[in-house]
Amino acid sequence: MNLKTLINTAALAISANTFAVDLASKNTDSYQHIRNATGRLNYAGKTFLIDPMLAEKGRYAGFEGTLNSHLRNPLVELPMKAEDTFKDIDAIILTHTHEDHWDEVAQKILPKSIKIFVQHERDGDLLKAQGFTNITSLSLEKPVEFEGIILNKTGGSHGTTEMYAVPQLAEILDEAMGVTFQAKGHPTVYLVGDTVWTAEVNKAINRYKPDVMIMNTGDARTLAFPNDGIIMGLQDVAHARNMLPNTKLITVHMDAV
C-alpha cells in the first residue's frame, strides 16, 4: 500500500454528514480537489478558490534542493480547463506565494479585480505589483468577515526550527498561513496550509475545534534535511485522526509537484 493510499484510507475513515467532498455546489458545504494544493471550497453559499497553480503539466523546472528536483512541475494536468477553476468563484484564499500555490499562469489569467485574501501586507504588495486590485490581508489578531463568513488566519511553520536556522533555507521557505472558515449553521473548516505540526496548529485546533480539516500532506523534503518534511505527512494524518476522532480529514498537496 503506497503513501497516497494510506493517507486516503486514514482520511476516509472519518466522516461528517454535514460536509461533502468533490461536490461542486454553492448550496452544499463541500470541497472539490483540483490538483496539488489547489481546490474549491463551497461554504455558506460562497465559493473560494484555494492556492491556484494553473499551469499545464511540466511547465516549470523542479524545485532546486528538493528530493524531486529532477521532475518538472506540475506532474499531472489539470482535470479541467484552467478557466473553469475560477468560474463563479467569490474569492481566492492565497496561503502564500510559492510557485506551486501561485504560479505565473494564475497571475496572468485570473481577473485582476477578484477578491483575494493573503497572509500579510508583503504578499499583498506583491499581488498589487502584479496588477491585482482587491486584496485583504488576514491577521492572527483580528478576524475578517466576508459575506457572513468569518475568516481567521492561523499560524504554522513551513519547515522545522532547524531548517529556519539556516538563513538561505529560511528565506526560501519563508512564511505560509492557514485559515479557518466559520459561519452560523455551518461546520467550521480549518485549512491548515503548508506547515509542519507545530504548537500553532495545536492552538488553532483547540481554539476553533474544526469539523473539517484540509491538510497538506505530501511530506515534501529537502536535500539538506532529508529526514524531515517541510509540510505534513502520513504521521500527521494519524495524529490528527487520534486527536480529532469526529473531524473529517481531507488530505491534499501530495502527488502533483
Predicted regions span which residues?
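Active-site HxH/HxHxD metal-binding segment of metal-dependent hydrolases
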Residues: 59-62, 79-144, 155-160
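Cap/insert and terminal regions of metallo-dependent hydrolase folds
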Residues: 74, 196-257
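Conserved beta-strand hairpin/beta-sheet module of binuclear metal-dependent hydrolase folds
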Residues: 24-81, 172-193
